[in-house]
Amino acid sequence: MEKLVLIDGHSILNRAFYGVPNLTNSEGLHTNAVYGFLNILFKVLDEEKADYLAVAFDLKTPTFRHKMFDAYKGTRKPMPEELHEQVPLMKEVLTAMGVPILTKEGYEADDILGTIAKREQKEGYEVTILSGDRDLLQLSDTHIRICLPKTSRGTTEVHNYYPEDVIREYQVTPEQFIEVKALMGDQSDNIPGVPSIGEKTATNLIVQYQNLENIYAHLDEVKPPRAKKALEEYKDLADLSLKLARICIDAPIEFSMADAKLENLYTPEAYEYMKRLEFKSIAARFGEEIKHESGPEKQFVLVEDFSEADALFEKAKKADRIGMELLAENGSVTALALCFEETGSYIFPVGGFMTESYIAGKYEELCRTGHAWVLDLKHSLPFADLSYGDTVYDAGVAAYLLNPLKDSYGYDDIARDLLGMTVPSRADLIKKLSCEDAYAKEPENFTRMAGLMAYTAFAAGKPLLERLTADGMEELYRTIELPLIYTLFHMEAEGIAVRREELAAYGEKLKRQIAVLEKEIWEMTGQEFNINSPKQLGEILFEKIQIKGGKKTKTGYSTAADVLEKLAPNYPVIQKILDYRQYTKLNSTYADGLGTYIREDGRIHSRFNQTITATGRISSTEPNLQNIPIRMELGREIRKVFVPRDGFIFLDADYSQIELRVLAHMSGDERLIEAYKTAQDIHAITASQVFHIPLDEVTPLQRRNAKAVNFGIVYGISAFGLSEDLSISRKEAMDYIARYFETYPQVKTFLDSLVAHAKEQGYVTTMFGRRRPVPELKSSNFMQRSFGERVAMNSPIQGTAADIIKIAMIRVDERLRRENLRSRLILQVHDELLVETAEDEKEIVMKILSEEMHHAASLKVELEIDMHDGKNWFEAK
């Protein structure tokens, strides 16, 4: 039998909206419901191997049910705006995929689905109805299956119902299912039902009497008496409810199976939507169909003749703007892509007289023209001798500044966002092949990819600069982000040395401690078990030894860190478990993990990323050296394995309380500024003023609490969050925060102004003009809006601190090189810089660090730096 899939459009879209976390694309469009809908659709189609597909939607106009009962669906809350804006978008996507959209004035989508399903079943089709509404179970039949999907965090499970499945779960047939609903009513649709009859009584009555008509025929026998009385009194409501709940299966719907025939969902038009909405995983389904592009046709010319290449390079030098990409990986250059005119790009592969050094040299020359745009400058620097004096425009970094919320800034992203073009990505064209392999095995696709890269860099350069200027970020781009590329490359190239033998010894020490903790936990619980198994751990803690306060989930007890941390003060075994987890993580992440990153030179060369975080902070990967533990003694000891070269030491310089100092400056709060100007203990002063006690009487606990408030305020902490951090009541936390704002009133005014500005403008800015969009403030969800308010308060402060450390990094690195010193900046961890310092250069490096870090920004309070040295990172910190 051929298969027809029918979808309840609004129902599935609504379910997807609440099942998938909030998503927006670079245009600011909410996309989570559409994304979830498509995932559900493709999951069902993959499993069904359907031949026909159609989607039914409700209209806003009244239906025949409203004529029967004015209050029908009258209790429903309005659709959230974030979902409402996705309904027309969903219809556009389906239309682009060639899927028929069905609506009918005066009828609901359920009626359309019921009519078509029953009709086509009679014609010999196998029908699947996809809906989030259990009311459709009444349509279940021999050849009609009802699929109810459940989506959680983007993962979908589908529950299937034929008549026997309905009977098994609800004890009634599909026909009787609606009789039950007529008795019990339906609050979501405002179907009244019979007052005082709930689901259990309704089910029992229908099981016993089969239907509503038969119940009334035997009303004298009905028990309990309360139900009998209600049925007598509210017969009209029962009859009305049955009519409202029953799906119409003979609606006047014009529908042709030929229109619903599944030919090709993966159309070029649909692919453009997937790219626009930034659904990369869904776009990947389009396979060969997506190897097209929208926009003017471009020519991508492969140039293998040396003389022709030389002439083109000379011509490019005279152009007003150049777009380039050096295709180089794994230490070797494959080709150079170049564009200097709208018609297309030239690709120069390595070969013959065009050696790697020749190609890299030409790239370097063109970069020095001062008007070259590339996609990823840092990636090319191992092959080109460029540095701070060379102005090369990086399109990826520019695109990041314009929208730091995206997860990628590839040429296909930039083409879509800046040029309005849909082009295939690298993965679309050469899959996972390296550039060298792609040129050898897929030369046509490689040439096309390279040409698109160069053209995108060329064409996007002008609009990128114009938008940066319009948004007030051109100076930030030129003076901080572009020079930073060189700084980060220098740090990556230098790396940091790791002693393998000490790393191995550290691992053994951890393993011994883990074994001790494991034995202690077993002894305290009276049983050997797998401590790493949440299921076993939950059963031991909350059932066997009966610890109070456990949270039961569908899969067992929650043993998440936040649950255990609340219980740890009262249960020593839980503190042991938390320690055990810390040590096992240290062992896997660092003792075992770091060794895989040590190269032949004995050093780890981590990657530093400047286009990852929304606030502007630099991140570190492969491995993440910014996440080295500092709270546990054994965690801090991992820093001992990081060592300088012979004849060198480490100098570590750390900004002291930089975010609080930025807060004092940006808020202009006189008391906070004065506290820093007098170089007093800011946390003790806050405790003294908040708790109204003399400074010399502040206790260590009060200072700790004041410190939590000080730093919490920077992150927009709520009373609930502070109460959790300090293990105090929410009322006490509210009092702390209120007193803090009484003490520093301009801080409150400043933070409120940030939120107000973000609500009005949609973004906040740092002291240096960096923008951070805050789309969460537009959400109809309270939790999302609250998160948005915290982001609005914190981002200008954290982002300004990030800008300051970037300025310091650039100046320190550039000055070390300018003064021909052997010492090198090798690591940045949030507010901390680590310099591998020649022993005979210690004094001058300390002077450079002090001067450049102090003068990185001019604040109303002085920037303070703590500096230490040592023979390893542990000693220097």
What kind of feature is each model-predicted range?
Residues 4-5, 9, 15-54, 70-71, ...:
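Conserved RNase H-like, two-metal-ion catalytic cores of nucleic-acid enzymes
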Residues 394, 484-493, 499, 655, ...:
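Catalytic palm active-site di-aspartate
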